[in-house]
Amino acid sequence: MSFFSPVNQARWARFRHNRRGYWSLWLFLILSLCSLGAELLANDRPLLVQYRGQLYVPVLKNYTEQTFGGAFATAADYQDPWLQQQLATHGWALWPPVRFGATTINFASTVPFPSPPSASNWLGTDANGGDVLARILYGTRISVLFGLLLTLFSSVLGVLAGAIQGYYGGKIDLWGQRFIEVWSGMPTLFLIILLSSVVQPGFWWLLAITVLFGWMTLVGVVRAEFLRTRNYDYVRAAQALGVSDRQIILRHMLPNAMVATLTFLPFILCSSITTLTSLDFLGFGLPLGSPSLGELLLQGKNNLQAPWLGIAAFLSVAVLLTLLIFIGEAVRDAFDPSKAV
């Protein structure tokens, strides 16, 4: 920690003192890394294959059936019993813990879908025959990435707008506040429903729409900090020396405003994940068939006779959001100098 300034060292010590938030951060990082490497944990392709003395990496490269002694030049189906027998006879295959991908259907199941947890499907299957655990892994990755990107883009826009309003004040601040009041009153959900009837919803499309209407969270915080500090002596001195407004805002005033801003980021991330989950649950989110926690919740509601669907999806969302709330509380304590270590 020697590369941290004394102030940051004290903040890190206060963050670690909040044990609940500290361990929540580590658990969230572990879950995020597992979801980012979902292909290595849940896949319908082997990680590594040794066939007749040759090594193959199906998880990274596509191979045809002819590669493994088949008659056709089509893509190898590693769920095919014939191909599995070929690999077992003439070599070996290293499989991930879950032998199903995000869209793989368990055709070998003898139980109607959705099927309960079993040795092959640890958390059961959904109404379409997909493995619930695999879909949770891939759905968590989409939710975390969506939340991080939405938090990043909306925070940048919000900080920029708040900084300009707070620094210049006057008519710029007045018209900026009136615009935000009007813009924040837009019925976002109805606009998404309307646009969904015209454009096929997708990851980037949803991200753009939610950023367009979700960047106002930090404006008030940053604006208040800039209004408070713009008359400080060091700002006046910089202006008297001819320092540009851009340099004053970015180098001298923004670091002070970021102290209050950073405490909001975990809660914004939590809200971003909830937004995507809610849209998927209502049917206005990701395209049909995409791995999504909200879509699993919807399946749980529509299949009350299969409680494992709703329970697995609910626990996944609840754990993810709870960890982020605990992290947010720890970050808030870390930036509060009145908190004793």
Locate predicted features.
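Alpha-helical transmembrane segments of integral membrane proteins
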Residues: 125-341
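Gly/Trp-centered helix-boundary motif
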Residues: 1-155, 159, 163-164, 289, ...
